[in-house]
């Protein structure tokens, strides 16, 4: 099956390059579009009123770092990137919204194979939320 628009969900870890390479290898033969997306957690949900944290400054700094990292991934992809998206909130809902808006038909995401990922896998959440084809790529941390 030839996909027309592939969405790569990245966490901006060094392993994100593996996902981009995998998606490019699938897109190139069919001249499919590729887009990148990164979803930040909503930091205001993590902090209570008991902790004095300037969330506005923190989110601006993180947003700037996210933009830089996405731009770098896009530039080094070796293939045209149609959209570079960044969102915050519920991962599944943000992806569903992007899929509908940009008419995407495949999501490529990674799954870290460590203890915590087995307990709290975002890939598992996506399987129950996203209603297009998915490719879940097993990732190993670089130091392994």
Swiss-Prot record:
Annotated compartments: Cytoplasm
A single Gene Ontology CC term: cytoplasm
Family annotation (InterPro entries): Rossmann-like_a/b/a_fold (IPR014729), Universal_stress_UspA (IPR006015), UspA (IPR006016)
Family: Belongs to the universal stress protein A family.
Primary site of residence: cytoplasm
PANTHER family documented for this protein: STRESS RESPONSE PROTEIN NHAX, UNIVERSAL STRESS PROTEIN A-RELATED
Lineage of source species: Bacteria, Pseudomonadati, Pseudomonadota, Gammaproteobacteria, Enterobacterales
Disulphide-bridged cysteine pairs: none
Quaternary structure, from the entry: Homodimer.
Pfam family, one: Usp
SUPFAM superfamilies, alphabetized: Adenine nucleotide alpha hydrolases-like
UniProt keyword terms in alphabetical order: Cytoplasm
Protein name: Universal stress protein A
Functional description taken from the UniProt entry: Required for resistance to DNA-damaging agents.
């Amino acid at each position: 099956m030839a996909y027309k628009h592939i969405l790569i969900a990245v966490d901006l870890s060094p392993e994100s390059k593996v996902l981009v390479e995998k998606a490019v290898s699938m897109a190139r033969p069919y001249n499919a579009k590729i887009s990148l997306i990164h979803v930040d957690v909503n930091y205001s949900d993590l902090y209570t009123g008991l902790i004095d944290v300037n969330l506005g400054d923190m989110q601006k700094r993180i947003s700037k770092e996210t933009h830089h990292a996405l731009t770098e991934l896009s530039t080094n992809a070796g293939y045209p990137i149609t959209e570079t998206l960044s969102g915050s909130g519920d991962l599944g809902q943000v992806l569903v919204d992007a899929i509908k808006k940009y008419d995407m038909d495949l999501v490529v995401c990674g799954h870290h194979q460590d203890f915590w990922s087995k307990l709290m896998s975002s890939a598992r959440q996506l399987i129950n939320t996203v209603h297009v084809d998915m490719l879940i790529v097993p990732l190993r941390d670089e130091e392994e």
